[in-house]
From Swiss-Prot:
Protein name per its UniProtKB record: Large ribosomal subunit protein uL1
Cystine pairs: none
Gene3D superfamilies cross-referenced by the UniProt entry: 3.30.190.20, 3.40.50.790
N6,N6-dimethyllysine: residues bearing it: K122
GO biological process: one example: translation
Entry similarity comment: Belongs to the universal ribosomal protein uL1 family.
MF terms in GO: RNA binding; structural constituent of ribosome
SUPFAM superfamilies: Ribosomal protein L1
One cellular component (GO) term of this entry: cytosolic large ribosomal subunit
Record's keyword terms, sorted: Methylation, Ribonucleoprotein, Ribosomal protein
Entry keyword Cell membrane: no
Positions of post-translational N6-methyllysine modification: K122
InterPro entries cross-referenced by the UniProt entry: eL8/uL1-like, Ribosomal_uL1, Ribosomal_uL1-like, Ribosomal_uL1/biogenesis, Ribosomal_uL1_3-a/b-sand
Species whose genome carries this gene: Dictyostelium discoideum (Social amoeba)
Amino acid sequence: MSKISSDQVRSIVSQLFKEAQESKRGFLETVELQINLKNYDTKKDKRFSGQIKIGTVTKPKLSVCVFADQQHCDEATKIGAEFMDIEALKKIGPKNKKAIKKLSKKYDAFLASESILRQVPKLLGPGLNKVGKFPTLLTHSEDMASKINDVKSTVKFQLKKVLCLAVAVGHIELTEREVATNIIQSINFLVSLLKKGWQNIKTLYVKTSMGPSHRVY
């Protein structure tokens, strides 16, 4: 049972859009959902992790890199996607923590060809997994551009050591209805991941990149 109404969320989103239009900043503002949890012990309780694909791109400028086999290297070149082949990954190596950290900061998400995905732990160690950026499988039957778009439309929740999370759920070039739908879908999915559902949620806020926070719950 959801504890927030769609009317309430739409009204808040309307306010966000109004503020963003009045301020007219020189870049595309992202809409962010900020979550504070309670009654959760990150040392004892299982740290949840999950992702949901929503109806629109949440962050158009989200950067994606493909760990590509030869066929995917050719496809990435054709569509202008960023990629690294197996030789480039071997050059980094699993012990070069500094380079792996730099790679994980440079890109928001990773895709990998099947033959390379299996080797990622051996090639790069556990670094990408630790920061919640382990690559998603890209098969040869999938269209690379569509798959990259799917990644840009995915909201990921991963609890680390602190009881607060922030995720992008849209941007101000979407319609108000689209952003409101994304927020509701994301919240309901998050609740399904939590041990005690709504009882684990302390507060929920939404805000644009530079705007004030608005409390949803």
